[in-house]
Amino acid sequence: MHTEHTRDRTERLLADLVRIDSTNPALGGDGHGAGEREIAAYVADVMHDIGLDVDHWEPAPGRPNVVGILPGAGDGRSLMWNAHMDTVGVEGMDAPFEPTRKHGRLYGRGAQDMKGSLAAQLVAAQNLKASDVPLAGDLLVAAVADEEHKSIGTEALVDRYDVDGAIVTEPTDLQLVRAHKGFVWIDVQTHGRAAHGSRPAEGIDANMHMGRVLSRLEELGRSLSGRQGHALVGPPSLHAGQLRGGSAPSVYAAECRLRMERRTVPGESAEEVLAEVRGILDELSDADEAFEAEAEIAFAREPLDTPADAPIAAATRKGLAHVLDDEPAPDTGASFWTDAALLAEAGTDTVVLGPEGAGLHTTDEWVDLDSVAHLAEVLAHTARRYCVEQAS
C-alpha cells in the first residue's frame, strides 16, 4: 500500500509536469514541438531541492538530459531509473497541458507516457534521500530526451554512465516486463521505365512490380504470425508502412518506394530480416528478367530479453510484492519497443515497469494516480533490495 503523503506528492508533481509543453520537435507539426528545455530545467530544480547531485547536459543542441545521482555509501550495485521527458504531438486535443483529475485519474498529454513515471521516480528518490538507511550503491534518476523519435537521450546516457541494473518506467499497468520486441525499417525500391500511358511496349511499371513485392510480403506476414514465437512477446510481424510511386496517371512509374516495418523478437537480428526480404526480391527477379529491385535497412532497434533470474528482475518482483501486499502477476512481455533495449545492449540488466493508464498517443490520455504512487513505492523498495553490497 502507498502512503497518502506519497500519493499527494506524486499527484502535485505530475500535474506540474503535464502543464509543461515538452512535445518532441520532430512530432509537433512542422518541426515546432517545444522540446525538453523547459521541463528539463524544472526537473533539475526538483532534483536539486531533493539533494541529488545533478548532471544536466545536451546530447544535441536544445535537447537536454538530466540525471540526479544519489551516491551510495558503499560498493553496492548501481541502479538507474529511466523516464523520457518528451511527448508526442497534441493534434485534436482541446487542452493538452491542463491536467484534469477525474475518478482517480489524471488526464493530459504525457500523463501516462510518461510524466506519471517521471513523477514517481522523483518522489521515490526523495523518499530514499530522506531515509535514515543509505543505499550501498549509487542510484541514478534519469530524465531523457527524444525517446518518441530517435532516442538520442538514452543513446547519450549509455555512453556517459555504466550501471549494473536499470528500470525503464514506461507504462506497463504495474506488471514486470522483461522482454519486448524490436523493429527494423526496411526501404524497398522497385525500378521501371517511364513511358507515356499510350505506349505500353515502351514502359515498365514499377508500381505493378511493387505489387508483387507486397503480395509476397503479405504471405510472409501470415507465415510469421504462425510461428511459435517468443514465450513472452509472441511471434514477429510485419506491415507496409509507407508507399510512394509514380509521377502522373498517364505515365508508367519509373520507381516505387516502400518503407516496411518488421517487428522482431528476441533472437532475431536486423541482418536476418533484411536477408529474408532480399530473398523475396531475388525470387521475383529470377522469375522475370524485367523485375529490378533492392532493399536496405533504414533504421533498426534490438529487442529486449532480460533473464528471469537477473538480480534486477528478482528485486523488482520483491518490490511489487511488498507494496501491493500480494504476489505480483507473472513476468510479461510487450509488443512495443522501449529505451530498455539500449541499456541492455550496453550491458545493463534492464526491466520495464510503469503505472496503469490508457490513451497514450491519443486525444484521451490518462494515468491512474494510485498506480503512480504505487510505482514510487515499488521503485524505492526495489532500490533498497538491489543496491546492496555485492558478494566478494
Whereabouts are the PLM-identified features?
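Acidic/His- and Gly-rich active-site-bordering loop/insert found
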Residues: 2-109, 135, 145, 386
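Alpha-helical metal-binding/catalytic segments enriched in His/Glu/Asp
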Residues: 81, 101-148, 187-190, 201-221, ...
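Acidic-glycine-rich active-site phosphate/pyrophosphate-binding loop
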Residues: 86-102, 178-189, 318, 351
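Short glycine/proline-enriched loop/turn "hinge" motifs that connect secondary-structure elements
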Residues: 89-92, 133, 177-182, 249-253, ...
